């Protein structure tokens, strides 16, 4: 449908609504029945609202047509037309303020930082995108609960939501009716009259519900307008927090219903009795008393819910013996919890006088709060710790946030198909943690590694889904249950179905495909076209429901009617016209036939070949035959004994980690390789179980996301095969950023010309040889980047250190130290203060139990942490904690680190506010530390006040490298769910691929906390914090300096590609911001700036700057009862290390 047809369609709907309104007005004048008049008034009110909606959409469509006309008249899209389209495409409800573009610093060019030089440009030197690409799309300022309220102004999003919801409810109810009809027939056959009558009553109710759902669906389909808009894709994203069933206590008050279509009665009958039933997961948990006036006085219901998703309200009339449903409403408990959280935060911030970023700096205070002229620039809420000295911002008449009582959710909600209901909700979560809504210590979370099941390259892991999913193989629903999902391509199916998957994972290249594996020569591609999804459809690949209404993300095959997301269509196999079940039957038949032929061939060879024929073929002929890739004629000539011996030797000569294999270990391929005798040590076949791993930096033992790792990629390809490198800007320093595609084959050709014996340096390193370390000379900022031909400075890639680097080789053990105090505790161990017995020098020793490391599959994570320490040691970075030694005992491993006696910033901010200058100083040093990490291909992923230590000279040092990820250059991505909840970027929560920009989001949260002594995204548990990160707009004191608000807006941008620091210049985008205009970065790096605060200690062993919760514990190593096997101990080979400095 083109724009002309859409305009015509909307015009017809406008005329129809006007005719209905006029008819209702005429009917109202001709009747005196108050009940009829009330119903006509409701119809006219809804008609006027629909009329406004249609007229608004007509204006949007006309403006879009006008914008397209302007584009066609010009040579290219002008900035005016781009911004014009932005205003047109913004869907109804997108009214939240947008952060400014991250490159918008030209207005502050006169305030450039001193000493920045050419490395801190006023704007990013790389080309920008389209004219309107720098401004992120505004976020919707409504919740799902707002959409089901009767008087919601967001009619467009409500139509999309209800189309999806009602269509799904209708599908479920129709399946339910089929089951009831079978029950009626069964009871009739058995002669059970009572059960038959009960089932018949349920059948009548189910049929009536289907009638109501069809009426509601038809109503919303008539209101829907097919206009391409980028609406929020809600249910098609598996959010780990928002879709989780909740447990707790739900309180409901039912007050009234009105404008419902009551059941028809006789002329002289009284008004029917009406009651409301409340269901939780299809179980009736509450029922109101009957009412004849549609009102209830004291209907309070409180009941516990256990892992419940949704509450259903059904309004019944009882005109005769059996009640008849007349209206329905569905409310998700997570929506109630989100509304309660937002109301509480809004009440606290309003009482404190905080506003959104667009109102900061305005002269008039918010209307709810009269601010006096004596108030300071900004201060923390009075309940935050350390704010007693600066509590003048909130006047006495404003209630402090701690006294703000959370009010229940109250309002009129829309019933389907007609009517409204007045409800009041409250919900108290069960087992809620304490202190999550305040600034304090919070542990990091990390997604645990799951058992991986491989099938045709898919890496299936079992997952629990909290929304309705459809199996991509058999097409049935998963329905709130566990299923299998590929970690790489997100293919989703039943647990019982994953073994029948016949399609190859997109992450598996053709080179990795087994040449003997069965393939279907059915190559009929689908013809996917965009379509407006008006009903409940599911993606045939990932199993999630398609977004309703928008053509942008919905595709449908014009031949076989298969539906998929736009981003999933390239993953759908070319089986148009063939179901997956049929494809699986064909492949099973091919496998059976091949096995039969193979068995026959082997039996024939055993009967006909003479013993002497084994040696009749010369080695030269075998070598000649092996040069033909398609020839497999000689693979069956060797005897079974020789083949088994060759396979055994073949598997032993390629030591590989014991992790999940990427390719199948079919005996056919191994036999072929054994007979061909083609350099087994360079082969890429996986090892057999139980092989001893190589400890030259090989991963796969506990890395949360080893599939992105450079080392696992080397293992997958084999040591001798050409290694496919990840993108690194340093590799392209002398190449134009926009080089022609013709240059790429030459680069690939050069990579293929590498010698087969080329091995990564980490595998050639001799662990017995001491490695010379670079001198700890502070690098100059003039030499840290290499400018490319395109003008984009890119960091030079330095070689990664080996996890088995022994350093100087000097042996250090547990008997060298005395433990003095406990400084902190973590997931697998603790950090203790220790002194050497000889020199009495103090060190912080991180102690981890081997048993826990192996149980949680974290061996590779420990190796990675050591490698990151060596990266920090490489240049003795002034703001990174350095490693002095590593050693191990039979039960534990130990990291010997420098002792920072000033405590962490969390302790100091709890003692008092930092102020702007102090926060700016710490932020500058943290920025340089992150810059160094990113220049060495490391993302930190756990930036928080707890991990930033303060030295006695007042400077900071970042500690705890347990969540760092290596080999993360510009453009590299990973997908592990990890971090501390308050600091996790939205892309992590949305289970998307992410890169270095997650560190800059956490950097924004850190600056916010240092300036305002509280988190920008708060909640009483992790789920509420995740909700806030995805939905809330950070608030600021009304007189907060504009430079501070600006950098926070740009860092806390939810779109990672628009976030400050996400470009190839990385930290330089942050360093050039007006917030740091007075910072001399060279002086900061060389510690020439006087720190604003110096921590105090009474003696060298004084631990008063650490939490007494830890320091009060006796510093002893608890005995470990378990004994590790020799194979487990081998996992830690090469861990010991000694630095060449003290």
From Swiss-Prot:
Task: List the record's Gene Ontology CC terms alphabetically.
Answer: cell septum; cytoplasmic stress granule; cytoskeleton; nucleus; site of polarized growth
- SUPFAM superfamilies according to UniProt: C2 domain (Calcium/lipid-binding domain, CaLB), Cysteine-rich domain, HR1 repeat, Protein kinase-like (PK-like)
Annotated Low complexity bias: 663-677, 712-724, 741-765
The UniProt record lists the EC number as: 2.7.11.13
Q: Which domain of life is it from?
A: Eukaryota
Under InterPro entries, the record lists:
AGC-kinase_C (IPR000961), C1-like_sf (IPR046349), C2_dom (IPR000008), C2_domain_sf (IPR035892), C2_fungal_PKC (IPR037778), HR1_rho-bd (IPR011072), HR1_rpt_sf (IPR036274), Kinase-like_dom_sf (IPR011009)
Q: Which residues bind ATP?
A: 823-831, 846
Q: Where is the REM-1 domain?
A: 1-67, 149-226
Under Gene Ontology molecular function, one entry of this record is:
protein serine kinase activity
Write out the transmembrane intervals. Answer: none
Pfam families, per database record: C1_1 (PF00130), HR1 (PF02185), Pkinase (PF00069), Pkinase_C (PF00433)
Protein's GO biological process:
cellular response to starvation; fungal-type cell wall biogenesis; intracellular signal transduction; pexophagy; positive regulation of cytoplasmic mRNA processing body assembly; regulation of fungal-type cell wall organization; regulation of nuclear-transcribed mRNA poly(A) tail shortening; stress granule assembly
What protein name is recorded for this chain?
Answer: Protein kinase C-like
UniProt organism field: Neurospora crassa (strain ATCC 24698 / 74-OR23-1A / CBS 708.71 / DSM 1257 / FGSC 987)
């Amino acid at each position: 449908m083109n724009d002309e047809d859409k305009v015509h369609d909307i015009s017809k709907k406008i005329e129809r609504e006007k005719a209905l309104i006029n008819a209702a007005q005429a009917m109202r004048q001709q009747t005196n029945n108050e009940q009829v008049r009330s119903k006509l008034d409701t119809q006219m009110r809804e008609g006027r609202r629909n009329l406004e909606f249609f007229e608004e959409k007509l204006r949007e469509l006309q403006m879009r047509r006008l914008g397209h006309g302007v584009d066609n008249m010009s040579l290219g899209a002008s900035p005016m037309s781009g911004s014009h389209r932005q205003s047109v495409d913004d869907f109804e409800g997108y009214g939240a303020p947008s952060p400014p573009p991250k490159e918008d610093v030209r207005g502050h060019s006169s305030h450039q930082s001193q000493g920045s030089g050419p490395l801190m440009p006023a704007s990013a030197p790389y080309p920008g995108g389209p004219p309107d690409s720098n401004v992120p799309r505004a976020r919707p300022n409504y919740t799902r609960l707002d959409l089901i309220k009767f008087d919601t102004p967001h009619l467009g999003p409500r139509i999309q939501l209800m189309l999806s919801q009602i269509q799904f409810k209708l599908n479920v109810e129709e399946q339910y009716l089929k089951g009831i009809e079978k029950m009626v027939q069964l009871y009739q056959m058995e002669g059970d009259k009572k059960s038959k009558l009960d089932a018949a009553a349920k059948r009548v109710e189910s049929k009536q519900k289907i009638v109501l759902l069809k009426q509601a669906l038809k109503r919303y389909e008539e209101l829907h307008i097919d206009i391409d808009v980028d609406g929020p894709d809600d249910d098609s994203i598996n959010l780990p927090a928002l879709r989780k069933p909740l447990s707790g206590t739900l309180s409901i008050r039912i007050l009234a219903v009105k404008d419902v279509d009551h059941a028809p009665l006789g002329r002289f009958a009284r008004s029917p009795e009406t009651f409301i039933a409340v269901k939780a997961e299809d179980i009736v948990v509450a029922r109101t008393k009957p009412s004849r006036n549609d009102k209830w006085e004291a209907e309070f219901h409180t009941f516990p819910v256990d892992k419940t998703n949704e509450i259903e309200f059904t309004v019944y009339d009882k005109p005769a013996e059996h009640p008849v449903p007349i209206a329905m409403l569905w409310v998700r408990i997570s929506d109630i919890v989100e509304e309660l959280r937002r109301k509480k935060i809004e009440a606290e911030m309003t009482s404190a006088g905080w506003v959104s970023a667009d109102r900061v700096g305005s002269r008039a205070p918010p209307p709810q709060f009269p601010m006096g002229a004596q108030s300071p620039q900004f201060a923390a809420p009075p309940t935050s710790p350390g704010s007693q000295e600066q509590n003048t911002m909130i006047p006495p008449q404003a209630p402090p946030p701690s006294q703000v009582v959370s009010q229940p959710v109250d309002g009129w909600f829309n019933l389907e198909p007609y009517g409204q209901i007045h409800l009041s909700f409250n919900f108290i979560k069960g087992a809620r943690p304490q202190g999550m809504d305040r600034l304090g210590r919070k542990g990091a979370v990390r997604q645990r590694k799951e058992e991986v099941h491989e099938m045709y390259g898919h890496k299936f892991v079992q997952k629990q889904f909290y929304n309705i999913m459809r199996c991509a193989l058999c097409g049935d629903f998963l329905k709130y249950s566990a299923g299998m999902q590929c970690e790489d391509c997100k293919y989703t199916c039943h647990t019982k179905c994953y073994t029948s998957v016949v399609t190859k994972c997109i992450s598996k290249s053709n080179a990795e495909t087994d040449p003997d594996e069965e393939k279907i020569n059915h190559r009929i591609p689908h013809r996917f076209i965009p379509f407006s999804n008006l009903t409940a459809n599911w993606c045939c690949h990932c199993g999630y429901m398609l977004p309703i209404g928008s053509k942008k993300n919905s595709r449908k095959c014009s031949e076989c009617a298969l539906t998929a997301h736009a981003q999933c269509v390239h993953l759908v196999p070319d089986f148009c016209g063939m179901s997956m079940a049929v494809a699986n039957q064909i492949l099973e038949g091919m496998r059976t036939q091949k096995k039969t032929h193979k068995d026959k061939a082997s039996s024939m060879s055993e009967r006909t070949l003479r013993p002497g024929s084994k040696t009749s073929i010369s080695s030269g002929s075998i070598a000649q035959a092996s040069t033909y890739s398609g020839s497999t004629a000689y693979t069956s000539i060797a005897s079974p004994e020789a083949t088994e011996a060759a396979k055994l030797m073949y598997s032993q000569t390629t030591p590989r980690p014991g992790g999940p294999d990427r390719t199948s270990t079919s005996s056919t391929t191994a036999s072929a390789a054994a007979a061909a005798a083609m350099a087994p040590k360079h082969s890429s076949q996986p090892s057999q179980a139980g092989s001893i791993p190589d400890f030259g930096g090989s991963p796969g033992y506990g890395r949360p996301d080893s599939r992105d790792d450079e080392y696992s990629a080397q293992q997958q390809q084999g040591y001798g095969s050409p290694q496919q490198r990840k993108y690194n800007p340093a590799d392209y320093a002398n190449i134009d950023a926009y080089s022609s595609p013709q240059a790429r084959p030459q680069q690939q050709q050069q990579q293929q010309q590498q010698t087969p014996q080329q091995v990564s340096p980490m595998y050639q390193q001799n662990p017995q040889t001491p490695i010379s370390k670079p001198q700890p000379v502070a690098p100059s900022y003039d030499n840290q980047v290499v400018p490319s031909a395109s003008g984009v400075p890119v960091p030079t890639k330095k070689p990664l250190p080996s996890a088995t680097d022994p350093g100087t080789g000097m042996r250090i053990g547990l008997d060298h130290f005395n433990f003095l105090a406990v400084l902190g505790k973590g997931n697998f161990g603790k950090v203790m203060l220790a002194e050497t017995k000889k020199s009495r020098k103090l060190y912080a020793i991180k102690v981890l139990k081997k048993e826990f490391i192996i149980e949680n599959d974290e061996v590779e994570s420990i190796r990675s942490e050591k490698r990151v320490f060596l990266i920090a040691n490489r240049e003795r970075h002034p703001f990174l904690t350095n490693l002095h030694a590593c050693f191990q005992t039979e039960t534990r491993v130990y990291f010997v680190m420098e002792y920072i006696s000033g405590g962490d910033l969390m302790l100091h901010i709890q003692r008092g506010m930092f102020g702007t200058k102090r926060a700016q100083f710490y932020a500058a040093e943290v920025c340089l530390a992150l810059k160094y990490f990113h220049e060495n291909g490391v993302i930190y992923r756990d930036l928080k006040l707890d991990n930033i230590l303060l030295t006695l000279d007042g400077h900071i040092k970042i500690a705890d490298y347990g969540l760092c990820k290596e080999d993360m250059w510009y453009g590299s991505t990973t997908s592990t769910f990890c971090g501390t909840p308050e600091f996790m970027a939205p892309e992590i929560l949305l289970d998307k691929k992410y890169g270095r920009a997650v560190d800059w989001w956490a950097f924004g949260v850190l600056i916010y906390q240092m300036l305002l002594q509280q988190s920008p995204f708060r909640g009483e548990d992790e789920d509420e914090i995740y909700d806030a990160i995805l939905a809330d707009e950070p608030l600021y004191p009304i007189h907060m300096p504009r430079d501070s608000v600006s950098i926070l807006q740009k860092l806390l941008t939810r779109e990672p590609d628009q976030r400050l620091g996400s470009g190839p210049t990385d930290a330089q985008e942050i360093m050039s911001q007006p917030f740091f205009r007075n910072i001399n970065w060279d002086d900061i790096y060389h510690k020439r700036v006087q720190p604003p605060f110096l921590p105090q200690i009474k003696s060298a062993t004084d631990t008063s700057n650490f939490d007494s919760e830890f320091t009060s514990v006796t510093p002893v190593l608890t005995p470990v009862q378990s004994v590790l096997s020799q194979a487990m101990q081998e996992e830690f080979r090469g861990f010991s290390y000694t630095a060449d400095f003290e």
